[in-house]
Amino acid sequence: MFLMTSTPLLLVIGLVREGLALASEYNFGGFEADPACTKDDKIYLVSMYAHFDRGTIDAIFSAFSDCKDEREAVEHYLKSRVIGPYNDYLSKFKVKIGFDAKDYDVNELVPTKRFDSSCELVEPVGTRTSAVHNHLLNTYKDRKIGIHLFLWSCPTHNENIMDKIVIGEPKECARSIGVLWRGTEETIDFIKSGISEAISGAKDLFLNQGFPSPRDEDKLSYVCQHVDTCIASKPSVNGAIIFGIDETSDDAISTHIDVDTHPSDVYIPPQRGARAQRVIYVNEPSDSVDDECKY
């Protein structure tokens, strides 16, 4: 009988383990684990509140000049260029992003804050995002502010200006994403990357203008921990659980979150004009008669 010594045996065991790891990573066996965060007939809707500085607002409104006003332009940009494609990818986790841009002008969100428009005195993206994040935390006593996206513009770009930053609170659901505006196309991947980091902790995904690799996608699966912790059955500033939705369907999620049920100590976007408070959903009919903002 052939006896294998301990050293070759350990070598074989190591090779087998390495082979199994490779097979799992590259799906050699054709088996693909379901990444969904739930097996139930429901989707986790993560609310995100979007804000832009004046330079970014002007740039987007100029690029989408057929939109009737600034708010419609920024909503159209996020809806068609960023959140729509991102949700198509995120749907495998049974998670979607619903964005709210009613409070789109950051100068109205924090009217007392004045930032260095030259972007030369201090690093702008981190400094501005941190300042507004702390302002929101200090304004709402229970620190329930949800996830906020801030797009910042600068007259010039240099290596000392960071492309994005994500600020979070330990063991809390509050997040602030700061992104440097680089134009309607180049900024998209940085926004997707910032959202991914805010909801999963995975850094620098989507920055290669493509989808994450299988290994990186596994990092994004930590979104399940975020929604399990932050999204409850009752709608809140963090989002809501939408029941009876087929994750493979292209139909719009039309259920509105009733933010009027939120406690007064959480962030609630202001009512503006005749529009009801709501979250914008991908493919949801617009309030505008002309929804085709041309680029």
From Swiss-Prot:
Residues 1-23 form the signal peptide. One of its GO terms (biological process) is sporulation resulting in formation of a cellular spore. One of its GO terms (cellular component) is spore wall. Keywords: Signal, Sporulation. It is found in: Spore wall. Its main location: other. Belongs to the SWP7 family. This is Spore wall protein 7. It comes from Encephalitozoon cuniculi (strain GB-M1) (Microsporidian parasite). The lineage of its organism: Eukaryota, Fungi, Fungi incertae sedis, Microsporidia, Unikaryonidae.
